[in-house]
Regions:
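Signature of the catalytic double-stranded beta-helix
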Residues: 133-145
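N-terminal secretory/targeting leader peptides
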Residues: 25-129, 139, 148-341
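Sec-dependent N-terminal signal peptides of Gram-positive bacterial secreted proteins and lipoproteins
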Residues: 4-23
Length: 341
């Protein structure tokens, strides 16, 4: 495998903080690196002890094992490499090797990825098992393939989780309780339309801006999976959580397309195996953190409100009928063929 490493290294544009800069010369040779290990910079917006990072750490160990130490990951949490849109742009241009991002900004990445908005519909999945069946199947692969030719190779669906609502004003049990409240959403038109349908005022903000916005009262609340609310310590400034499970939110592992296409068969096998097993590990870690998050935050004084979900489902039906959102109806039908079984 080491004899084949030159091809891979000729394609990797590594900008390391504590190592020589490696870049490809006009003749395809690698300049500025004397290391036998190729390091892929992978960025995410989440906390170092969260399920994204712990999943990447699992993949890191597997990649080192399967490549005999010739490939590894350098993990940058807490938006150290920028917000999710910034990182996707950087990966597509080759100035960053990899990222793990939520699906929120993907529909606006390019015309080809506009169909990803179907995954943002409220109450699309009843449970994680339904989501896995769809995302790991034909529909998921069709969506991943829409990145082909964009500079990004989308490798698979990891997990963010079901998104619940936090605020620091009152218990919210019904959509009527949301009237007039300013709720931070992802920069995603389906999410914004959903909160408008619920009577709230959606305020799109990048993840890195949320905490200060909540502290300063710029927004009244936000929504995220319990695992994120816990590990990002959102509960320190938001003391009410409503268990609405409004959206199932996956995340996607991405690598620069030229780097991936430059792998030898042996390298690709090692990388793909590590990524697939890393995905399984990350999903398990997400469930582990999520299962204990409520009890941990209740012990810290957070008030949880269980809701009649049927009321919320009814309140967002207009989103499914909103033709301005450009939802691919054939893809929605394919998803519902699984979820309605």
């Amino acid at each position: 495998m080491k004899k084949k490493l030159a091809l891979l290294m000729a394609l990797v544009l590594v900008i390391a903080l504590c190592a020589p800069v490696a870049h490809a010369a006009d003749d395809g040779s690698l300049l500025g690196s004397d290391s036998a290990t190729v390091r892929f910079k992978v960025g995410t917006t989440t906390a170092p002890d969260g399920h994204y990072v712990r999943g990447l750490q699992a993949m890191q160990k597997l990649l080192e094992e399967y490549s005999n130490g010739e490939m590894t990951l350098d993990i940058y949490p807490n938006s150290a490499l920028g917000n999710e849109s910034d990182m996707m742009d950087a990966v597509s241009m080759g100035t960053q090797e990899m990222c793990l991002v939520s699906t929120g900004p993907i529909p606006s990445f390019s015309k080809k990825t506009a169909n990803w908005g179907v995954l943002d519909l409220p109450y699309l999945f009843k449970n994680a098992e339904q989501a896995y069946e769809v995302l790991d199947g034909e529909v998921g692969q069709t969506l991943l393939d829409e990145f082909d030719g964009s500079g990004i190779k989308a490798l698979g669906f990891w997990e963010n989780g079901f998104r619940d609502l936090t605020n620091d004003k009152k218990e919210i049990a019904t959509p009527a309780d949301l009237a007039g409240m300013k709720i931070r959403t992802m920069e995603n038109k389906v999410h914004m339309a959903t909160y408008t349908a619920l009577g709230a005022n959606p305020s799109p903000l990048a993840w890195g801006e949320i905490f200060s916005a909540l502290q300063q009262g710029t927004v009244d609340g936000q929504e995220n999976p319990l695992a994120i609310i816990l590990t990002a310590k959102v509960y320190e400034v938001q003391h009410y959580i409503s268990m609405i499970d409004l959206f199932y939110s996956p995340c996607v592992l991405m690598i620069n397309e030229d780097i991936y296409n430059g792998f030898t068969a042996e390298q690709k096998e090692a990388f793909d195996k590590a990524a697939e097993e890393g995905k399984a590990a990350e999903r398990a870690i997400s469930k582990e953190i999520g299962d204990s998050a409520r009890a941990e935050m209740e012990a810290l004084g957070v008030t949880f409100t269980d809701v009649d979900q049927d009321v919320w489902v009814e309140a967002v039906q207009s989103v499914y009928d909103d033709t301005s959102l450009g939802i691919d109806q054939d893809m929605l039908a394919a998803i519902q063929a699984v979820t309605d079984m």
